[in-house]
A protein has these predicted regions:
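Active-site proximal beta-strand in glycosyltransferases
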Residues: 58, 73-91
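Membrane-proximal helix-turn-helix segments that form the acceptor-binding/catalytic region
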Residues: 46-53, 68, 72-76, 88, ...
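Nucleotide-sugar-dependent
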Residues: 171, 215-250, 257-265
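Carbohydrate-associated surface elements
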Residues: 123, 141
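Conserved catalytic-core segment of nucleotide-activated headgroup transferases in glycan assembly
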Residues: 10-25, 143-149, 154-223
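A short, well-ordered alpha-helix in the C-terminal region of glycosyltransferases
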Residues: 288, 295-310, 316-319
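C-terminal alpha-helical cap of glycosyltransferases
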Residues: 313-335
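Conserved acidic donor-binding segment of nucleotide-sugar-dependent glycosyltransferases
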Residues: 269-280, 288-294
């Protein structure tokens, strides 16, 4: 089986976790893999799309194509699998009107014409089902060889509440900052560590700022005592696939999250982490975890187990291979 994967950039987290980390497994199981960046100019597009007939399957990662361009690609590809891990059919959080006609038109046009869709969560699956019944949920997964549980905390002053992410999601942490500042006035024994390419300031809470790098990501995660994933409850956020939580679980951290979208599936409230639905719950649950080291450790162990059982590369790579083989072998004409 020959597959062409079209991606935005190997530097993008989504590409690494949804596509590139699966490539070694696919090759080990006899799949010929070719990786291509999405072309920018029409000559580049015609050049690439003209080669697609040689592949059994073309895998597109999270791009919404203009209908005319997608139709040109569709005519050249035997089979198309589309991978989606964000609510691309909506505008991002904070927009006055989350609905976008242009995005919806592109999304609907593509979904009606691809052979199969791999969705990162059940919300995205439900969006796809309006147009195409050939869809399966494959959660974002971690290669556990790159993550080990942090050792017991050494004696140190205070607790580190950690947040790791991209600048585009820093707004969710900004919304949590007043709660952290209010909590610090009551319990001034913690610091906030932000691992990102952008940062926040606080005149109340001590903030440690660390530029994100792939090489130091695991080390930075292990410097946290508690991992947080605040979100807003909107259509865009419901499409998120919980990568932060999985990374926290990877090093055995307890997690507090807003129970939106897949967060509700990954985190079992009170078992491997806590849900925080409002400011009061954020305060109460952060305080409880900061004061109880044994609880932090127990939740972290359960979180790691959750990761191993349902969100690991070892579990989900065979599932992806099975999906791709099934689509490539399907009889009948493409849409």
């Amino acid at each position: 089986m020959k597959i062409a994967f079209l991606i935005h950039s190997p530097e993008v987290n989504s590409c690494r976790y949804r596509v590139l980390q699966y490539v070694p497994y696919l090759k080990e199981h006899g799949v010929e893999v070719s990786i291509h960046l999405y072309p920018r100019t029409w000559p580049e597009k015609w050049s690439l799309y003209g080669t697609l007939r040689q592949y059994d399957l073309v895998h597109l990662h999270r791009r919404l194509f203009p209908p005319a361009e997608f139709w040109a690609l569709r005519r050249k590809a035997r089979r198309i699998v589309y991978d989606i891990d964000d609510a691309l059919m909506y505008r991002s959080s904070g927009k006055k009107n989350p609905r976008s006609l242009s995005r919806r038109v592109k999304f609907a046009f593509m979904m009606k014409r691809v052979d199969f869709v791999v969705a990162g969560n059940r919300f995205l699956e439900s969006e796809v089902l309006s147009y195409n019944r050939h869809v399966a949920v494959l959660p974002t997964s971690l290669d556990l060889s790159g993550y080990s549980c942090k050792e017991d905390s050494l004696q140190k002053e205070g607790i580190t509440i950690g947040w790791l992410g991209s600048g585009s999601t820093l707004k969710y942490l900004r919304d949590l900052m007043p709660t952290l500042e209010r909590l610090f006035r009551k319990f001034p024994h913690f610091r906030l560590k932000i691992v990102c390419d952008l940062f926040l300031e606080s005149s109340v809470v001590p903030v440690i700022k660390k530029e994100w790098s792939l090489d130091e990501e695991e080390k930075d995660l292990k410097s946290f005592d508690i991992g947080v994933m605040p979100l807003s409850d909107d259509l865009w956020s419901r499409g998120k696939c919980g990568l932060k939580i999985l990374q926290y679980f990877g090093v055995g951290l307890p997690v507090i999250c807003t129970p939106v979208g897949i967060n509700r599936d990954i985190v079992e409230d009170g078992v491997n982490g806590y849900w925080a639905r409002d400011e009061k719950e954020w305060e109460e649950r952060l305080l409880k975890l900061m004061q109880e080291e044994g609880l932090r450790k127990a939740m972290g162990i359960r979180g790691r187990r959750t990761l191993e059982q349902g969100y690991s590369l070892a579990v989900n790579a065979p599932r992806l291979l099975n999906i791709l083989q099934g689509v490539a072998a399907r009889e009948g004409r493409s849409p």
